[in-house]
A protein has these predicted regions:
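Extracytoplasmic cell-surface/polysaccharide-interacting catalytic and binding patches
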Residues: 1-183
Length: 183
């Protein structure tokens, strides 16, 4: 899947403000809205207030980044479209629980183990950058669902070469699963 988010958050040299005992990057207090990192080690703050506006199809996105999203989609000349933007904690809970149920049904594993497996593909509630209103999942021309097959397309190459110009990055590269916790 293609999950892009505005700006990047680069871990600095490890010290008491950026590294936990487990070695995972810790979000510094007071990080700017466009540098927020959300993952299993940095959940959404309970008091985080999204500034959302409605985008095509009723999806919501952060109002401070919507113009960059529109510009990126426009520059792609119809070869990409938005699949998923902001998700409420309730929706994330539903998606996660559905994945847990699927893992349990397919593997026979108990719930605790199924949750661990599910969390590698669907973020636990409160640990998805979609909960901020800054993450985007894109569908590429010719695809009706999220697929890794698009990685071999010219459109994917264009996105990787140009998304940073619009303030977006590929948030979960395949070779960084140990760092991001997301496959």
């Amino acid at each position: 899947t293609s999950n892009l988010q505005t700006q990047s958050t680069k871990p600095q040299a490890q010290d008491s403000t950026t590294s936990s005992a487990s070695g995972h990057y810790v979000q510094p207090a007071g990080a700017k809205w466009n540098l927020k990192l959300v993952n299993p080690w940095n959940p959404v703050d309970s008091d985080y207030a999204q500034s959302l506006v409605t985008y095509a199809g009723g999806n919501k996105f952060d109002s401070r980044a919507i113009d960059k999203l529109k510009a990126l989609v426009s520059a792609a000349n119809g070869k990409i479209r938005v699949a998923s933007l902001y998700r409420t904690i309730e929706l994330q809970t539903k998606l996660f629980n559905n994945k847990v149920s699927q893992v349990m049904a397919n593997t026979g594993k108990p719930r605790v183990e199924a949750e661990t497996i599910a969390a590698t593909e669907v973020a636990r509630p409160g640990t998805s950058e979609h909960n901020l209103g800054l993450a985007v999942d894109f569908l590429f021309e010719g695809y009706s669902s999220l697929s890794e097959k698009f990685e071999n397309t010219a459109t994917y190459t264009w996105m990787m070469q140009n998304c940073a110009e619009y303030g977006f990055i590929l948030r979960f590269p395949k070779n960084k699963q140990a760092v991001t916790g997301v496959s």
